[in-house]
Amino acid sequence: MIGDWRVQQVARVVRAGGVIAYPTEAVWGVGCDPWDEDAVLRLLALKERPVEKGLILIADTVEQFDFLLDDLPERWLDRLSGTWPGPNTWLVPHRGRLPEWITGRHDSVALRVTDHPLVKRLCALTGPLVSTSANPAGRPAARSRLRVEQYFPQQLDAVFNGALGGRRNPSVIRDLRSGEVIRPA
């Protein structure tokens, strides 16, 4: 088990504007503080990902997303009920409450409450994190720390070692408004 000191150390890196890699439910992810524009733009540059595409935010509890979920129609909240924590990412209207470097050209943002124990502990200390697969655009997502280090040699501020969550595929992505599956699991 990863010690609390290591979780705290990686959380300090995130709060200081660092870009980190960490295991998720299915693949390795890279992330940073979503409120730190410089960190997000650096992460996007590492991945060669255009800002217009938008990013996923992960959290350890639904409450970390309350500022985005309050005032939503009850039928939408019913769709979320029972799907978090877990491998379910929802496109939620952001209503101008998030910066464009997170949302890209979209009127919604992708949100997931993780069930990965290590990432939950990290998000408990940092708040929500940007979470995107650890790979340059067009390359397969990293499934090992070695592959992360090959993709991003000496470009990350911390690599939070741990085991993947055992899922075969990244999370399903659904639109909260329609319930439509955007990306199957």
Swiss-Prot record:
Catalytically driven reaction(s): L-threonine + hydrogencarbonate + ATP = L-threonylcarbamoyladenylate + diphosphate + H2O
Membership in a protein family: Belongs to the SUA5 family. TsaC subfamily.
Single GO molecular function: double-stranded RNA binding
Domain YrdC-like: 4-185
HAMAP family: TsaC (MF_01852)
The protein's role, per its UniProt record: Required for the formation of a threonylcarbamoyl group on adenosine at position 37 (t(6)A37) in tRNAs that read codons beginning with adenine. Catalyzes the conversion of L-threonine, HCO(3)(-)/CO(2) and ATP to give threonylcarbamoyl-AMP (TC-AMP) as the acyladenylate intermediate, with the release of diphosphate.
Protein name: Threonylcarbamoyl-AMP synthase
Major site of localization recorded for this protein: cytoplasm
Entry's EC annotation: 2.7.7.87
InterPro entries xrefs: DHBP_synth_RibB-like_a/b_dom, Sua5-like_dom, TC-AMP_synthase, TC-AMP_synthase_SUA5
Originating species: Stutzerimonas stutzeri (strain A1501) (Pseudomonas stutzeri)
Gene3D superfamilies: DHBP synthase (3.90.870.10)
PANTHER family: SUA5, THREONYLCARBAMOYL-AMP SYNTHASE
A Pfam cross-reference name: Sua5_yciO_yrdC
Gene coding for it: tsaC
Subcellular location: Cytoplasm
A single BP term in Gene Ontology: tRNA threonylcarbamoyladenosine modification
Entry keyword annotation includes Zinc: no
Keywords: ATP-binding, Cytoplasm, Nucleotide-binding, Nucleotidyltransferase, Transferase, tRNA processing
GO annotations of cellular component type: cytoplasm
